[in-house]
Amino acid sequence: MQNYREEKIDRVRELAMRVLQKVHAEGAYANVALAETLREMQLPERDRRFLTELVYGVVKAGDTLDYMVGRYVADIRKTQPAIRELLRLGFYQIFFMNKVPASAACNTAV
């Protein structure tokens, strides 16, 4: 069974995935979609910072992440939107975030 902290982190990653889906699939602006989510969820400051880093980081590194994922996925554009965002989030955490253990990023992406 997961402990309370792991459940909170997983919730933040889930929120990041939803915000990114709004950005990439629906054409929402990242800052607007993120602000709405932060306002609705009333997260603790640490979780707000983590969510913000995930969303802006994936958006900023988008082409690089798609290239990296594309080395393992035949055509990322044909991948289901939720799966595509999970892969981007996982790759971003593994390759761009120093403080997130690769095992944690991989575990939550799967």
PLM feature spans:
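Class I Rossmann-like S-adenosyl-L-methionine
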Residues: M1-V110
